[in-house]
Amino acid sequence: MLMPKKDRIAIYELLFKEGVMVAKKDVHMPKHPELADKNVPNLHVMKAMQSLKSRGYVKEQFAWRHFYWYLTNEGIQYLRDFLHLPPEIVPATLRRSRPETGRPRPKGLEGERPPRLPRGETDRDTYRRSAVPSGADKKAEAGAGAATEFQFRGGFGRGRGQAPQ
């Protein structure tokens, strides 16, 4: 597809910087969200990535109406040559992430846990005993209960049925 060279370069620069590219499958979208400041249509992004995919420079995934493209090693080399970048510059997906340093902890609690609140076993036992009175038979009380006369009514949406007598 014919597209301005500035659009192709903007797409390739973003792809090389991030290492991945995401685009919604919408050819009528006026601007790609990540390239909105450069006024690049979403169709140009999709077609440029399709071209790179056919040459084996990106891997494509598609899920939930979105394309996901990942740079391959050959694609990194191609974009480095195309954009005239030195070998020291690498995509964000290949950079090592530094482990985040946590908040500094207070000196007094190193290796220690604060003690739990002391609760006696008596609290637990009284709770368990209060639920079921002693001497009650659980199996005898299971079932429909003390009601011996059942009344059946018409179901939901099945008409009114007969009036009770």
Curated annotation (Swiss-Prot):
Residues 97-128 have a biased composition (Basic and acidic residues). This is Small ribosomal subunit protein eS10. The lineage of its organism: Eukaryota, Metazoa, Chordata, Craniata, Vertebrata. It is found in: Cytoplasm; Nucleus, Nucleolus. Residues 92-165 are annotated as: Disordered. It comes from the Eukaryota. Residues 142-153 have a biased composition (Low complexity). Keywords: Cytoplasm, Nucleus, Ribonucleoprotein, Ribosomal protein. The gene is rps10.
